From Swiss-Prot:
NCBIfam families, per the entry: Obg_CgtA (TIGR02729), Obg_CgtA_exten (TIGR03595), PRK12296.1 (NF008954), PRK12297.1 (NF008955), PRK12299.1 (NF008956)
Name of the protein: GTPase Obg
Name of the gene encoding the protein in the UniProt record: obg
Subunit structure: Monomer.
Provenance organism: Exiguobacterium sibiricum (strain DSM 17290 / CCUG 55495 / CIP 109462 / JCM 13490 / 255-15)
Keywords: Cytoplasm, GTP-binding, Hydrolase, Magnesium, Metal-binding, Nucleotide-binding
Location relative to the cell: Cytoplasm
Record PANTHER family: DEVELOPMENTALLY REGULATED GTP-BINDING PROTEIN-RELATED (PTHR11702), MITOCHONDRIAL RIBOSOME-ASSOCIATED GTPASE 2 (PTHR11702:SF31)
């Protein structure tokens, strides 16, 4: 089964918890803090494996959770950082954030890696918080939570040449003749329902990878007939070979077929029309093929057309030489040129903006709700089982201006304040 699109969930490892400990040795009174830091949590990493050809493995496992870092220990010993979780994907995999549809990575080359979820930082032990004013702190941090994301993986096959055309025009037959590939061939439409790949070698020892793509129909660019699934595999090809049934035995007009397929390519992605395209008039061994070819050339006098018969191998030698010339002369197309046309341009920056401040709002229960990445991170890394950690948490909120904002919103003693799933009372005298 060929699988070229899946949705998965990834969760990076949390950081290990920092330790509260003190140096306790004979003849060393008041040894001071000696709590170690927690280890960093594991990343979730996608890595290209050239031995894979589809995303089939993800049909059976879609949740990937990395391990957390080791907790800090006494005697100043830090926890071990966790080993990253490496998930193998086939070459040509494009990774999207399923919530924003932003491109996270384009994985092409064997061994190429991309971190799709970062592990959390390990919490600091109490030895990190010692100051002249507080030489023996009883405060340590929890580990930072690892990132979690829903991702969409799309496989856009890596082939130098893509065969496109209506169903039953002879694409599979042509691939089976010029390469060692053995696609399914039948006298009915949509015999090919998944892409097939073969390596073609010319008589002058040049080689290229050719993909036989399932037949397109009118409206493919809008998803008709699984058009989006088929067209995405054309995006990486350097050369498009447009195969046309010149016999007319299916009751179609070769001129109309040529115009319709090119319109679908342009509607799906305008950049596809910039690729070199080789027009192949197939089934020239059939009756009426010559007459149809003459009419086709009259309609497109400036178009280079290769007349062949895949069944009898007529004209294949010159065709393959021409394709090899174009493959050699055409550069690779980068990811920015592969992006599908959308209503608004998709922009992805590598720069990460600084964490924003916070917001205070009231919910339907008159509870004050505080939100903000920095505050929520502080909350998750605070150990509320220790009084000193709670005091430090409250002091940090006050320094950030949270208590002042609550007063502006009308908070008085006894009002409930919520951060994530944690609720506490606003007390003017101590907050």
């Amino acid at each position: 089964m060929f699988v070229d699109q899946v949705n998965i969930y990834v969760k990076a490892g949390d950081g290990g918890r920092g330790q509260v400990a003190f140096r306790r040795e004979k003849y060393v009174p008041d040894g001071g803090p000696a709590g170690g830091d927690g280890g960093h949590g594991a990343h979730v990493v996608l890595e290209v494996d050239e031995g894979l050809r589809t995303l089939m493995d993800f049909r059976y496992k879609r949740h990937f959770k990395a391990v957390q870092g080791e907790n800090g220990m006494s005697k100043g010993m830090h926890g071990r950082k966790a080993e990253h979780l490496v998930v193998k994907v086939p070459p040509g995999t494009v990774v999207y954030d399923d919530d924003t549809d932003a491109v996270i990575a384009d994985l092409v080359h064997h061994g190429q890696q991309a971190i799709v979820a970062k592990g959390g930082r390990g919490g600091r032990g109490n030895s990190r918080f010692a100051t002249p004013a507080n030489p023996a702190p009883e405060h340590a941090e929890n580990g930072e939570p690892g990132e979690e994301k829903y991702l969409k993986l799309e496989l856009k096959m890596l082939a130098d040449v893509g065969l496109v055309g209506f169903p039953s025009v002879g694409k599979s037959t042509m691939l089976s003749i010029v390469s060692a590939a053995r696609p399914k061939i039948g006298a009915y439409h949509f015999t090919t329902i998944t892409p097939n790949i073969g390596v073609v070698e010319t008589e002058d020892s040049r080689s290229f990878v050719m993909a036989d793509l399932p037949g397109l129909i009118e409206g493919a660019s809008e998803g008709v007939g699984l058009g989006h699934q088929f067209l995405r595999h054309v995006e990486r090809t350097k050369v498009i070979v447009h195969v046309i049934d010149m016999s007319g035995m299916e009751g179609r007009d070769p001129i109309d077929d040529y115009n319709i397929i090119n319109k679908e390519l342009a509607d799906y992605n305008l950049r596809l029309t910039e690729r070199p395209q080789v027009v192949v008039a197939n089934k020239m061994d059939m009756p009426d093929a010559e007459a149809n070819l003459e009419a086709f050339k009259e309609a497109f006098p400036d178009l280079e057309v290769f007349a062949i018969s895949a069944a009898t191998r007529q004209g294949l030698r010159d065709l393959l030489f021409r394709i090899a010339d174009l493959v050699d002369a055409t550069p690779e197309f980068g990811l920015e040129e592969l992006e599908e046309k959308t209503a608004t341009p998709r922009v992805v920056y590598g720069y990460e903006a600084p964490e924003a401040g916070f917001t205070v709002s009231k919910d339907e229960d008159d509870c004050f709700v505080i939100k903000g990445p920095r505050i929520e991170k502080l909350f998750t890394m605070t150990n509320f089982m220790r009084e000193e950690s709670i005091k430090r948490f409250a002091r940090t909120l006050r320094q950030m201006g949270v208590d002042e904002e609550l007063r502006k919103m009308g908070a008085i003693d006894g009002d409930v304040v919520r951060i994530r799933d944690f609720e506490f009372e606003f007390i003017e005298s101590s907050f």
